Amino acid sequence: MLDRVGPGFQDLCRQVLPTLPTLSQEEVSTIWANVSDFVERQLTMHKGVQISGLGTFTFSRQQLEVGNKKFVLVQRPVFIMAEKLVQTHGLKQNKVFSPGDIPVVPLNFVMISLEGPFNRDTIEGCVKETLLFLSRSISVKQKVEFTFKGIGVLSIRDSKVKMRFYKDFLCSMDGSGILTKALANRPGTMDSVLSSRESYRKRPNSAMAFPRIEHKETENKTPVEVVGEEGGENRPRKIKLKDQSDKEGGAREISSPKKHRERQSISPAKVTSVSLLDKFERSGNGGKITACENLSSPGCQRNDNERPRTSPAPACQDHNKAGQEMCYVCLQRAQRNFALHYGDERRRREIEDERLMQQYQILKDQEAFFKNQVKGMAAREQNQKNAAYNLGVAEAIRNHKNEKPEFYKSFLFDKRPLSPEINAFKQEEYSQSLLKQMESKREKEIKQRQNRELMDRLEQVQLTEELAAQRAQYLKEKMEETQHYKRALDAQVKNKPPQLPMFEPDSAEPIFGKNDGEREMEKRKREQSCMKHQMEAAASHKRNTILNQLVDQRRDLQMLQRTQREHMADRAAEMDRVNRLNQCLQEDWDRSLAMKKQRDVEEKAFERASDKLFLLDQCEKYRRCRQCQRRTCNTGESNLWPMNKFLQGSRLLV
């Protein structure tokens, strides 16, 4: 693949890609085959897998109509390209919606390393650098086909992303076969199923095939033989070194299938920091030592030039190193265990990714600058051609004008020729259409005028009716008002007081007050009864007022008496509380005095006593491990007796 990339990018690859140049095509394919197996295994458990920098394998649920208003829920695997990669290169992909109840796990490099002979850093570097090559190929608008073993093929052509799954993989995801038929029959997904893997591998030469990457740097590497013992037979294994000057490089031994099964049994959550002790196995006759199995990081691997370490001493009696507070077992475990600091490693990777992105951005900027420069040169050449053409045309026009300076563009005819018959027919048609338009316009104006006159007459009739109705209403209201006034005058005449008596001169009888006696008597009786009622009401009110005053006085007296009793009770309670407080204080003082005397006696006795009196001071003689809380001379034995423990001096098996 490096042969198709520019020389500047080849130099950059040699500087910033340390892992891929040390691997062959078969090893890269093996690593990605293990990655595909991990993805397929997680999809079989209905879990999605996220490959950082590439995309996510997950599931999508759809309802397919099978007829008669019946639907079947189908769950099919899908691949969603990473949004960052899509935005960077302007890729196009069909939008797929995945449900939120499907868990998505990241790519676990530790689990992949347990399945093959490569360590975690090698696998991670191979995956990331392969994705960098993929991003570079997409940026230069090349056709890319990325094969996932056992899953399908990811193709990118003309900035369009398409994931095609193998038919066997879809059948393993859905044993009923409905999913394969549904995808093959639908217009949008009919090209998402590969019926034959061999036929699809015959791809054109213009397409970049991933993950097989060719490197020229791997040709000069010398293989190193690592001999491992497995079942009593020595089998050589050739492994290529990264660099001869690299101190952290080392030989890797392919473990037996049994050991692979033991490694696979480890759960992913417990393999965050793996550092196994070197295991030495001696055969019964030859006494040969096998190479160590080490799953830690490359910084913790041994070189081939180092000799195998001898087995540690069986016991350590004194064990009095400076600051040593651990037993023999914990000390050996701490010396052989190397912690993996993921924070520093993560920061280092982030810095490396940023540096790669900066260099990649510089390359893209240079390419854009070169493209703009080429476009500018092409535009300049085109402008020069246009200017030369315009100059030639202007020169030709100028020469033509100079040759015929008295050329006129207008002409005068003495007699206008007659129009042909075809134009006469057209003129007749035009005149007929104009006459029709005039007639229709005239009819329209007449109809509008008639409508206006009709509306005016209707408005006049309506106005006349409204005026007549208003006149009738006015007359009706006037008649009602007249009748009202008449009834009022009749009532006044009816209720008119009697007239004054006629004047009689020299009359001996009284004129006024003849019938006033009876009225005065009735009036006086009414006044007397009213006064009597008022006197009774005043007396009852006064009596009620006096009774209320007496009741209030009695209530106030009772309240004062109750307040006095409560005050006396409060004073008595306060006196009791003060007395109790004084008594408690006196008792506390006596108790404190007795305790002080006792403490003084104990201090004097402690001063007279010898050292190592307390239990904690006595425990200093018995050193304990700070991790397992056993004695420091512990070499791994247990305080529990086995079932076949033989007691000395006895013939019993306990």
UniProtKB/Swiss-Prot annotation:
GO CC: one term? Answer: cytoplasm
This one is known as: Coiled-coil domain-containing protein 81
- The SS bond pairs are none
What residues bear Phosphoserine in this entry?
A: S206, S273, S275, S296, S419
| Coiled-coil residue windows | 431-562
Q: Where is the composition biased (Polar residues)?
A: 293-302
Keyword list, A-Z = Coiled coil, Cytoplasm, Cytoskeleton, Phosphoprotein
Q: Which InterPro entries match?
A: CCDC81_HU_dom_2 (IPR040673), Coiled-coil_dom_cont_p_81 (IPR026295), HU-CCDC81 (IPR028034)
> Species name for this entry?
Mus musculus
Q: Could you tell me where the Basic and acidic residues compositional bias lies?
A: 212-222, 232-251
Q: Which Pfam families does the protein's record reference?
A: HU-CCDC81_euk_1, HU-CCDC81_euk_2
Which cellular compartments is it found in?
Cytoplasm, Cytoskeleton, Microtubule organizing center, Centrosome
Please, which domain of life does this record's source organism belong to? Answer: Eukaryota
Q: Outline the segment boundaries, as ranges, of region: Disordered.
A: 196-270, 293-318
